[in-house]
Amino acid sequence: MKLRKIMAGIVATSVAGTMAVAASAQYDAFIMYASGSWYPSTMDASGHSEDAASGTVTEWTAGTAEVTKDGTYTVSVSGIKASAVDEETGEEIMAPTPGEGAAVFNVDIPDLSTALGIGANCEGYDATMTAAQKMEFAKSKGINVTDVKITQVTDGETTEVAVDSSKIFFGDIEGNGKFRIELYNQFGETKNDAPLNVADIYFNESLNVTFTISGIDAITGGNIKPADTTAPADTTAPADTTAPTTG
């Protein structure tokens, strides 16, 4: 079967079957991944994306983990498919799509940095700090990430991707309240001294990351609360736009 990427239209029936997948919730860790060519890209936990320019639909299964306590967690991305055209029949289908290399490869945990007091708007945090400094700030509060392990599955065979944990950055790297474990980001500081060889990444079934995080329980007492992500109320008095009296 010969395939080509679909450049227009949407495989409606397949999309309908995946729209029930929920977007990432507070503290649900997920893999943010884009291949070396940016195709495919699975940048959140929704399991569905559509390229506005080309109309290409991408679907995947996001294996998430709720991170609210110290512990070891595993997250994954699997079953990646993208809209394509069978060149023999002209039929629009969802075709299995492997991931090769990486432009972006992170684990993101929404709102966790805010909840732990190690992110933007927290005392001592400075958005101008480097990724290394943001990580040291998180460590100064007792947070640490260790024992990072990356595995991938291709044609039923599991292999491990070597990773140097000493080169990983973690914390509120982007200043948005998320807790990020940055494994590789061509726009980030890991590009300069990568923790892994992106050429080692190739999978057609799943990509998996296991990590251990500590320090949460000491900060929260084992009872993490929902992070406040609401914008502060505008307390500025409205301008007086009434015309002055002349009588």
Model-predicted segments: where are they?
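Gram-negative bacterial Sec-dependent N-terminal signal peptides
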Residues: 1-24
